[in-house]
Amino acid sequence: MNRNLLAHGFLIFALCIGVAGCKSGETYSCPAGDVLKGEPPPNGQEVWCEKTIGGQPVKDGLFIFWTDSGGKMIEGQYKDGKQDGEWKTYYETGEKKSIDHYRDGVQQGEHIGWYINGQISAKGQYKDGQPDGVWKRWGPDGIRNWEEVYKDGKKVS
């Protein structure tokens, strides 16, 4: 009986690690002085770090949001209540959908988007929240569809 119980426990552990990632077993850390809020699936849909500024709670540090089915949908960081650093989005199936970068709540730097099949859909840069420089788009088959150039959010070619 103990042998069966041990084997059953190991099987559940292996399936959890291999298939679901054991969200309840993951650890999440916040910057010093911040408090971890929310719950991951199956009991919740998001976790975030929070601190108080001027008597008001604001997000600061880790932020993760999951779909209704438990797949990770959004992952990023906040700094003093504003998006900061790298933000990733995922399709319901778990494949990456996009990576964007933020500074002080404003999109800044490289954007990369993917189709659900893994092919890159778009690549470009943001400057002060506006498209800037060369932007390229590809079809789901990997063939580039177009290329445009932006300056300060305006298409120039």
What are the residue ranges of the model-derived segments?
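Glycine/tyrosine- and acidic-biased, solvent-exposed loop/turn segments at the edges of beta-strands
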Residues: 15-157
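Bacterial N-terminal signal peptides that target proteins for export
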Residues: 1-10
